[in-house]
Amino acid sequence: MVTIRLARHGAKKRPFYQVVVTDSRNARNGRFIERVGFFNPIANGAEEETRLDLDRIAHWVGQGATVSDRVAALIKAANKAA
């Protein structure tokens, strides 16, 4: 099953997440099909906290991809801000 979820990157105690489309059987930071955005939970100042390609996310959801709870919350916040 294809899912849209977060892959953790960054340094210890400084997480940075990529929003990726991947097979649910792959490891959290493993192989992915497409990168559709990022989320920086510790962004400050002029740094961008979230960037999502909502068109590609809609495409993958239309293809049957499931969305993780956290990514669904990020999408909801992005739609609210736009």
From Swiss-Prot:
InterPro entries: Ribosomal_bS16, Ribosomal_bS16_CS, Ribosomal_bS16_dom_sf. One of its GO terms (cellular component) is cytoplasm. Belongs to the bacterial ribosomal protein bS16 family. It comes from the Bacteria. It holds the Pfam family Ribosomal_S16. Keywords: Ribonucleoprotein, Ribosomal protein. Coiled coil: none annotated. GO terms for biological process: translation. This is Small ribosomal subunit protein bS16. The keyword Ribonucleoprotein applies. GO terms for molecular function: structural constituent of ribosome. The keyword Metal-binding does not apply.
